C-alpha cells in the first residue's frame, strides 16, 4: 500500500476530514495558527500510529509505556509505526548533555577505554603495561654492542638507612646496586643518612646488546619485575654510551611516582557512574554556593536592608548586626559597599572563633546577653538551606545561589584518572569542549595504526557519522558537554532529529513540529537536506511547517484552514506546491505565489543619534567585547546565524541590566560587561519569552491576562448572586465555596491504571464543569461561568462587547492572532508561541507610557504568513507609541520590516560573538560579510519591484 488513507477525522476542531497522503514522501502540513495542523499531524496520525504499535505489545510491556488516547477518526489505513519529534526541551536533568542525548558520548567512552593511553597526571609519562616480550624486543632494537645494565628499582625516594634491603639483596646473590645514582658493590655501600630520601636500584644483569640474548634477557626482566613490583630500568654502563635510561612497566603505573590505574573500562569515563565521576561535584561539573552579590545590595546601608531578612523588620537578626557593629566598630548607617573589607568579611563569613557580646531584647522587654562567635550571613544561609524541610524556605533561599565550575575537575565532570587518558593528542574532556563542527573535523582526521586502528575503526565510524548529522542540522556551534537544559526548543528538536538519522530506520512515519525554529536561513538549507535524506531512506516524513523553503521543497502540501479554531479544521488545498500555489482559496498559496505579501515599509523611521541605548564590552559566553547600540523608539531586529550570541547579548546581558535598574529585579544574573548608558530614555522593560504562562492545568489565558477577575465581578453583580450573597470568590475554581469539591475545581479526576496510561475522567459530580450546582445557576446574559470559560476569545469578544474593560483585553488577544483559543484553556496545552502571544497581549492591554523597552525572542514561532502580518501590526503599533522594540528573529519577513538591524556573526560558537553589520535592512543587505544580508537582498529587491 503506497498511501495513508484518513477518513472522518474529527479530533479537536477537525471537521470530518478525509485525506489521502502519499507514503515515503516529504509532506508539509501548513495553515494558520490554530487551524488544526497539530490536531491532524500529532493528535490523529501520530496518536493512532503509536497507539496501534503499543497495543500490539503484551499487557506486561504496556504498563511501562504511556498509551495515547484513541483519536476521534473513522478509519486510518496504511499507517507505519510513528515517531514524533517535537519542540519540547529535552531534559531538565542536569546530568544530560548534548553528548549523552545523541549517544556520541557513549561511543567516545568506548573509544577511550579500548584504545586510550593513560598518562601520569603529575609526570605526564604514559602508563602503558608492557609484556616481557615487548620489553626484550625494545632492548634488542638498541644499537648493537651497547653496554647496558638491567636494574630493579627497589626503593624510591624513601627516608632511612635501608640496611635490611641490602641484606636481603646479598642473600639473594646480587652483587651490585646503584644508590642515589652511583654504582657500588653491595659490600662497599656507604652508610646512608636516615634523615634523607634515597633511591636504590639493584643491578640484575649487565650485558652487551646482541641478537642471541633473548632468553637471558627475558629471565632477567622477570627477576627485575618481581623485585620492583612490576617496574624495571635499562641504563647505560658508561656515561659515553649513546643510550638514554629507559623505564619499563608491567602494569598501568607511573614508574616515577607509582601512580597506578586499573584497566581502562568505559565506566571510568562516565560522569554518571561513581567510577568515573569527579568526587567533589559528583559528576555535575558545577558547585552551588551562596553568592554575596545576590545576597547583598551594596548601595543600601545595613539599617536600610542591604541584606534581605536582616533589616529592622526582623528584630532578632537586626539586633545581632547591631551588636556585631558595636564589637567591631562599624556603622549600620553606612552603605555596605563603603564598609572596610574586614568589616564586610565579618558580616558575610562570620567572626571565626572570636566571641562577640550579643544583646537581645526578648518579648517581655528584658535584655538578654550572650557571648558566642558570629556565624556569618552566608554560612547561616548554607546551614538553613541544608537543614530545612520546608520546600518554600528552600525555594526562597535558592534565589541566593549561584553556580561555579567545580574547582577540582574545572567543569569537566570526570575524576582525575579519566582526565589524563589520551587518544591521539586529545583527552576526552578536550574533545567534548570542542564545537561539534571542530570535533567532526578532528574525528575525520584521526588515524590510528596497527591493532588500535582495527579496534577503533567501527567506533570511529559511528562517532564521525553522528557528529556529521549534528553538523547537517545546523548545530555545529554546540559543544558535546553543553548541558541539555540550556538548549532551546528548536535545538533540542534538531538534536533528536540527528539521533533519529543516526538510528537509520526505514519504513517509519516521522512527524516533526516546525524543525526550522531558531534556524538562520543559511542553516535551513542543511536542515531541509536532512529531511530529504530521511525520506530517501524510505520513510514518510510529515512536517508541520510555515517556512517558505520547506513548503516549496515538499513532495506534497496540505493547507488546513480557512481560519483558526472553529473557522478552521478543513483541508483547503492539497497537492504539489505548484497546485497549492495556484489554488484560488488557499491563503498559503496566495503568499507563495506573491498575490499576497508582507509589505516592506515605504520608508524607514530614522533614528535619533542622541537617543541610544549603549552597551559596551559585553563578553558573556562567546561574545567578544561587543559594543551594542540600539536606537530608542524604533523597532530593532537582532539577527545572526544560530549560536552567534544573540540570546547572550539580549536575554543574558541587556535584559537583566535594564530589569535590575528599572523593574527592581534582584535575582537576575548579568553576563559580564563594562558599561551601559541610556536608562534615562526608559521607565520599564518587558521580556516576552516562550516559557509557559503557568505549569498547572489551573492556569489559563483568562487568569493570566487578568480577564477572570472582572468576569467574576460581573457574575457577582447579577441580582440573583447578590440576593444569595455571592462575592467574586464564589466564581473562582481555586478556592472553596463555589467550586465542585469532588474534583476541587479541576473538572477531571485522575484514575491510575496499571498497564494502561493514567486516565482523566470527567468528574461525575459536576460533569467536568468545575463548579457546584448553585454557582452554575447564576447566569450573566443567559450564560453560566462555565459556559463563559468554554468560549473562544472571538466568541467572548462579541459576548462582552458592552464591557469596555473586558472588550479591550479580548481585542488585544485577537490582535495577536489568538482568536481561536478558549478563555479557560489549560496553560499546559498552549504551545511556546501561543504562550508568548498571551504574554504579549497582556502587555498590550496595559496603558503604555511610550518609554517601555519590549524584548521578544523569536515571536514568529508557530506563525503562518497571515499571522506574522498581524504580529507585525502589533509590534509597529508599540513602536509608533514611542516604545523601543527589540526582537531576536530569523524570519526574513520580520527582518525586512524592521527600522534597524544588528547582525551578529560571522559564524556560531567560538567563531561568532561579534557585531558584523548594523544599519537599516537596505544597508545590511549590501554588506558582503553578513549572511543575513545575503538572504535579505533578493527579498528586498523582489518586494520593491
From Swiss-Prot:
User: What do the Gene Ontology cellular component annotations say?
Assistant: cytoplasm; excinuclease repair complex
- Source domain of life is Bacteria
What Pfam families does the database record attribute to this sequence? Answer: UvrA_DNA-bind, UvrA_inter
* Zinc finger annotations (C4-type) as residue ranges: 254-281, 740-766
Location of this chain's protein in the cell: Cytoplasm
One GO MF term: ATP binding
Ranges of residues in domain ABC transporter: 310-587, 607-937
Q: What does this protein do?
A: The UvrABC repair system catalyzes the recognition and processing of DNA lesions. UvrA is an ATPase and a DNA-binding protein. A damage recognition complex composed of 2 UvrA and 2 UvrB subunits scans DNA for abnormalities. When the presence of a lesion has been verified by UvrB, the UvrA molecules dissociate.
Q: How does it assemble?
A: Forms a heterotetramer with UvrB during the search for lesions.
Q: Which family does it belong to?
A: Belongs to the ABC transporter superfamily. UvrA family.
Q: What is this protein called?
A: UvrABC system protein A
| Name of the gene encoding the protein in the UniProt record | uvrA
Amino acid at each position: 500500500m503506497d498511501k495513508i488513507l484518513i477518513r472522518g477525522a474529527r479530533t479537536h476542531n477537525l471537521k470530518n476530514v478525509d485525506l489521502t497522503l502519499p507514503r515515503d514522501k516529504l509532506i508539509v502540513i501548513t495553515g494558520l495558527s490554530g487551524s488544526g495542523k497539530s490536531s491532524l499531524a500529532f493528535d490523529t496520525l501520530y496518536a493512532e500510529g503509536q497507539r496501534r504499535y503499543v497495543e500490539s505489545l503484551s499487557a506486561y510491556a504496556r504498563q511501562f509505556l504511556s498509551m495515547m488516547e484513541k483519536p476521534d477518526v473513522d478509519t486510518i489505513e496504511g499507517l507505519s509505526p510513528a515517531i514524533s519529534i517535537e519542540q519540547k526541551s529535552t531534559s531538565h536533568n542536569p546530568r544530560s548533555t548534548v553528548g549523552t542525548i545523541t549517544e556520541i558520548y557513549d561511543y567516545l567512552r568506548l573509544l577511550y577505554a579500548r584504545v586510550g593511553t593513560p598518562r601520569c597526571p603529575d609526570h605526564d609519562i604514559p602508563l602503558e603495561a608492557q609484556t616481557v616480550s615487548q620489553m626484550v624486543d625494545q632492548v634488542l632494537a638498541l644499537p648493537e654492542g651497547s653496554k647496558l645494565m638491567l636494574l630493579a628499582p627497589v626503593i624510591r625516594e624513601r627516608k632511612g638507612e635501608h640496611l635490611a634491603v641490602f641484606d636481603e639483596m646479598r642473600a639473594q646473590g646480587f652483587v651490585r646496586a646503584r644508590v642515589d645514582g652511583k654504582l657500588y658493590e653491595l659490600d662497599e655501600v656507604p652508610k646512608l643518612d636516615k634523615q634523607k630520601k634515597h633511591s636504590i636500584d639493584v643491578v640484575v644483569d649487565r650485558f652487551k646488546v646482541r641478537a642471541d640474548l633473548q632468553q637471558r634477557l627475558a629471565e632477567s626482566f622477570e627477576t627485575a619485575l618481581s623485585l620492583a613490583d612490576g617496574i624495571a630500568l635499562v641504563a647505560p654502563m658508561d656515561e659515553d654510551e649513546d643510550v638514554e635510561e629507559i623505564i619499563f612497566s608491567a602494569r598501568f603505573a607511573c614508574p616515577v611516582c607509582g601512580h597506578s590505574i586499573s584497566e581502562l573500562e568505559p565506566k571510568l569515563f562516565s560522569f554518571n557512574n561513581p567510577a568515573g565521576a569527579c568526587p567533589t561535584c559528583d559528576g555535575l561539573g558545577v558547585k552551588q554556593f551562596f553568592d554575596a552579590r545576590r545576597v547583598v545590595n551594596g548601595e543600601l546601608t545595613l539599617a536600610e536592608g542591604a541584606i534581605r531578612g536582616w533589616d529592622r523588620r526582623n528584630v532578632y537578626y537586626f539586633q545581632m548586626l547591631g551588636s556585631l557593629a558595636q564589637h567591631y566598630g562599624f556603622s549600620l548607617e553606612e552603605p555596605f559597599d563603603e564598609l572596610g573589607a574586614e568589616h564586610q568579611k565579618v558580616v558575610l563569613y562570620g567572626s571565626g572563633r572570636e566571641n562577640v557580646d550579643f544583646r537581645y531584647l526578648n518579648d517581655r522587654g528584658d535584655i538578654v546577653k550572650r557571648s558566642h562567635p558570629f556565624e556569618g550571613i552566608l554560612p547561616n544561609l548554607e546551614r538553613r538551606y541544608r537543614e530545612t524541610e520546608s520546600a518554600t524556605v528552600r525555594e526562597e533561599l535558592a534565589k541566593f545561589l549561584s553556580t561555579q565550575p567545580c574547582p577540582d575537575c574545572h567543569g569537566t565532570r570526570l575524576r582525575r584518572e579519566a582526565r589524563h587518558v589520551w587518544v591521539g593528542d586529545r583527552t576526552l574532556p578536550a574533545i567534548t569542549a570542542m564545537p561539534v563542527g571542530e570535533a567532526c573535523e578532528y574525528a575525520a582526521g584521526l588515524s590510528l595504526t596497527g591493532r588500535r586502528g582495527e579496534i577503533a575503526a567501527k567506533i570511529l565510524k559511528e562517532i564521525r557519522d553522528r557528529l556529521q548529522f549534528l553538523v547537517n542540522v545546523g548545530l555545529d556551534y554546540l559543544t558535546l558537554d553543553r548541558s541539555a537544559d540550556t538548549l532551546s526548543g528548536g535545538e533540542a528538536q534538531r538534536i533528536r532529529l540527528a539521533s533519529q538519522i543516526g538510528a537509520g530506520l526505514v519504513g517509519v512515519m516521522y512527524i516533526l513540529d516546525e524543525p526550522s525554529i531558531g534556524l538562520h536561513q543559511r542553516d535551513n538549507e542543511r536542515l531541509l537536506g536532512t529531511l530529504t535524506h530521511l525520506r530517501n531512506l524510505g520513510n514518510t516524513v510529515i512536517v508541520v511547517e510555515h517556512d517558505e523553503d520547506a513548503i516549496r521543497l515538499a513532495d506534497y502540501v496540505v493547507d488546513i484552514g480557512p481560519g483558526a479554531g472553529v473557522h478552521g479544521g478543513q483541508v483547503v488545498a492539497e497537492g504539489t506546491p505548484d497546485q497549492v500555489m495556484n489554488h484560488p482559496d488557499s491563503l498559503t498559496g496566495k503568499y507563495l505565489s506573491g498575490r499576497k505579501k508582507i509589505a516592506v515599509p515605504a520608508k524607514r523611521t530614522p533614528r535619533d543619534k542622541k537617543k541610544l541605548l549603549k552597551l559596551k564590552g559585553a563578553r558573556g559566553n562567546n561574545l567578544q567585547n561587543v559594543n551594542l547600540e540600539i536606537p530608542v523608539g524604533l523597532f530593532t531586529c537582532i539577527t545572526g546565524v544560530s549560536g552567534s550570541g544573540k540570546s547572550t547579548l539580549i536575554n543574558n546581558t541587556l535584559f537583566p541590566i535594564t530589569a535590575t535598574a528599572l523593574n527592581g529585579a534582584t535575582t537576575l544574573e548579568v553576563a559580564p560587561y563594562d558599561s551601559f548608558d541610556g536608562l534615562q530614555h526608559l521607565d520599564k522593560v518587558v521580556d516576552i519569552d516562550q516559557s509557559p504562562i503557568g505549569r498547572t492545568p489551573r492556569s489559563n489565558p483568562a487568569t493570566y491576562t487578568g480577564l477572570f477577575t472582572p468576569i467574576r465581578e460581573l457574575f457577582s453583580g447579577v441580582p440573583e448572586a447578590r440576593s444569595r450573597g455571592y462575592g467574586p470568590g464564589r466564581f473562582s475554581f481555586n478556592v472553596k465555596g463555589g467550586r465542585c469539591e469532588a474534583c476541587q475545581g479541576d473538572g477531571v479526576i485522575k484514575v491510575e491504571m496499571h498497564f494502561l496510561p493514567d486516565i482523566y475522567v470527567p468528574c461525575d459530580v459536576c460533569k467536568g464543569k468545575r463548579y457546584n450546582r448553585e454557582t452554575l445557576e447564576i447566569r450573566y446574559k443567559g450564560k453560566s461561568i462555565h459556559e463563559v470559560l468554554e468560549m473562544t476569545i472571538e466568541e467572548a469578544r462579541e459576548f462582552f462587547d458592552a464591557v469596555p474593560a473586558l472588550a479591550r483585553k479580548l481585542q488585544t488577544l485577537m490582535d495577536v492572532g489568538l482568536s481561536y483559543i478558549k478563555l479557560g484553556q489549560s496553560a499546559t496545552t498552549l504551545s511556546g508561541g501561543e504562550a508568548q502571544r498571551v504574554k504579549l497581549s497582556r502587555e498590550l492591554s496595559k496603558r503604555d507610557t511610550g518609554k517601555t523597552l519590549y524584548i521578544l525572542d523569536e515571536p514568529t514561532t508557530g506563525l503562518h504568513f497571515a499571522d506574522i502580518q498581524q504580529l507585525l501590526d502589533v509590534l509597529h503599533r508599540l513602536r509608533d507609541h514611542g516604545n523601543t522594540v527589540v526582537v531576536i528573529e530569523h524570519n526574513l519577513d520580520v527582518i525586512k520590516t524592521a527600522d534597524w538591524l544588528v547582525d551578529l556573526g560571522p559564524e556560531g560558537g567560538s567563531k561568532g560573538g561579534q557585531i558584523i553589520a548594523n544599519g537599516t535592512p537596505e544597508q545590511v543587505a549590501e554588506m558582503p560579510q553578513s549572511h543575513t544580508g545575503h538572504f535579505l537582498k533578493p527579498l528586498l529587491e523582489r518586494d520593491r519591484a
